[in-house]
Amino acid sequence: MKKVFTFLLICALSLCGAIGLTACGGNSGEKDISVVARDQGSGTREAFDRVVTDGNGNFLEMKVDGKTVYKTTSKASLLKETGNVMSMVARDKNAIGYISLGSVNDTLKVVTVNGVMPSAATVLDGTYAIQRPFVIMTSSKTALNEITADFLLYLKSEASKTHADASGCIYLSNPEQRANAGETPIEVETYTVKSSLPSGGKITINGSTSMEKFIKAAMSGYAKLYGKTADELFYIDLQGSSVGKTAVKNDKNGNVIGLSSAAVKQDGINSFNVALDAVAVVVNKSNTTVNNLTLEQLYGIFTGKITKFSEVAEKTESSDETL
């Protein structure tokens, strides 16, 4: 009889292991969320971190005693470029990240934030919380050469609307929105094609990877006006908004245009906001657990306090009645 009892006990334990630890009161084996973030020089990260909050006055990036404190979990993968974030999230079923709305494609799933899907309409009406300007920067201390000044005028003109529309960002025509809050409004300029290509050699473009689609469209559009290709007129190296700011500050030849995907207000830099963009929260396309996240849930995930998607899965109330 004792042998029979032992045999039955072994069978029961084997069955428990086969159907998973959850059924026996243990862990289901669900994998941890893979947090994918941008590096600290990214304007996209700055825009995301300064909005995502725990609801009690804490943000992923904030000033504490005059110092900037970053609260993204140390377990996060920190990547330099938008494309790298997209590739990692597309490969990893447990990943979550954030990218420019204009960069979203069908390899990723976009999650609503506070119940709102990012779009041109929800950015303009302010209902989508995580948004930022696309900023064009030049040196305020070094005069621009002829061709760089001409391209800047082109960027400030109505021509930029075509390129913004094509790249998925929201063109700004309102002079007040084109300037920093409280500063002199920046009007839309009129661009006239010159009789010949302005002098000055190649223009250097540095800065935000999120603005790549927009600036490449603008470069190509400008070059065509003078029968040239973009490669003939521009040198482009996009490594993040902070790199763009540094390049503009260090411009000694008047040939640098910087790009930032977060608001800019710094000494030594002239800037204007050419467009608005949403920062979209993305997960793997196969993720059926999460469709919506609140800012507070995002804070929990990106600080590492929430480690499983099941913790933020939307609960549906059962209609079964207890008899």
Predicted feature residues:
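C-terminal motif of bacterial Sec signal peptides marking the signal peptidase cleavage site
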Residues: 19-23
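Exported/periplasmic ABC-transporter solute-binding proteins
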Residues: 25-323
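Generic detector of N-terminal low-structure segments
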Residues: 7-9, 311
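Bacterial N-terminal signal peptides
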Residues: 9-18
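Positively charged n-region of N-terminal signal peptides that target proteins for export
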Residues: 1-7
